[in-house]
Structure formats: structure tokens, C-alpha cells
Swiss-Prot record:
Quaternary structure, from the entry: Homohexamer.
Cellular component GO terms, alphabetical: cytoplasm
Pfam families named among the record's database cross-references: AA_kinase (PF00696)
Protein name, entry field: Uridylate kinase
EC number: 2.7.4.22
Phylogenetic placement of the source organism: Archaea, Methanobacteriati, Methanobacteriota, Stenosarchaea group, Halobacteria
Regulation of this protein's activity per its record: Inhibited by UTP.
InterPro entries linked: AceGlu_kinase-like_sf, Asp/Glu/Uridylate_kinase, Uridylate_kinase, Uridylate_kinase_arch/spir
Major localization listed first in the record, in broad terms: cytoplasm
Amino acid sequence: MRIIVSIGGSVLAPDLEAGRVEAHADAIDSLVADGHEVAAVVGGGDVARQYIDSARDLGATEYDLDALGIDVTRLNARLLVTALNSSAIPEPAESHEDARASMRRGEVAVMGGTVPGHTTDAVAAMLAEMVEADLLIYATSVPGVFSADPNEDPSAERFDRLEASKLVDVISSIETTAGSNAPVDLLAAKVIERSGLRAIVLDGTAPERIADAVDGDPVGTEVLPNE
């Protein structure tokens, strides 16, 4: 299979802990060893938010804040490249075209953000669309997609599976609720819907769940193309 794995920055390296990065690299290496084509997109996490908060206090524009966040995602991506044993791209790709070219060469493409205004959630969905991926995995800090933000609404229920149109509706509702956080952003959800991508949103704090998802084990929430 052709697989795109999106790893949240706070999941990959919450405290820049080498062991965590290595565990995620091992998960990707195992997919490659099983014959899959793999690319990884890495987020910025708490480190990016700390830089952004400081820069905002210093008067940076929203564009500059986005650019700063992208820089951090690429640093995290470079950490992952360093940990990979498989034939990873020598340095993080800075565009979808570069990542696609890397995959065509048989490399593991690794990238962070691309342009201001696009989260790494969206970057991963766009890459999956571009390379016609068989599966898009979001390794997040939550165990799937819920009917509402479970941190804000204790009655929120997790979906085992849902169609992409329902994902768009759920994410749209969560993003318009003050203080709530969605497991993937709305642009990513819309790209998933328009492309008919199959996606799985899972708790990536245990990296082995990535391989479990590829093997078809019931982990997280499966997003299916609209009927």
C-alpha cells in the first residue's frame, strides 16, 4: 500500500525525547520492511506553540507566526529523518512535489509544513491526494474522532467509523465551538472528502498503533469515502 502518516508534533517529540522519535521511526521502518510505500508529515506541537506565543508578544504578524510554525515542523521532520533506518529522504521535503518525487525514487519522504495558512493536517491530506494514497493515518493525541471535543464535553462519543461528509460536519461543529480542539482541521477533512481518501485517526502516543491500523486492527476512527 501507499501510506501517508501524519504525526502530531506533540506526539512525536513532546519533550524532544529521542526515544519517542525513535519509536515512531521504528513504526515507519516496519511499514517499509513490509513492502509499503510511506511518507510522513510532522507537526510542530507544543514547541511550535511556544515560539508562536513569544513571537506574537513581540508583535509578529499572523503570516510570520505561520512561517515560524513551519520552521519548527521542519526541525521535527529532520529529527525523524535522523532516526529512520530505511532509505529516507536526505532532508525534509519543502513541497508536495518534492515529497512525491522522493517517493517515486523509492525513498521515505518526510516533510513538515509548506506554506502559511496550511496546517500539517492539510499538508498530509494534500500529499495523500497527490500521490493517490491507499491510506492516510493521523497519529494524534486523541483516540479518534468524537462527536464533540471530549475535553469540553464529557458526553462526547467516539466514532468507530464515519463517512467523509460526516467528518466535515463534525469538525466544522467542533471548530466553531470556543475553546474546543478538533483531531484534524477542517481543510484536511474537506480534502479527504473531495478525494475519496480512506483515513484513520488514532492515538499515536503508542506508535505501534500505526502498524496495527495498516494491518486492519480496530484502532481509532476509520474515515470512509462517501457512498
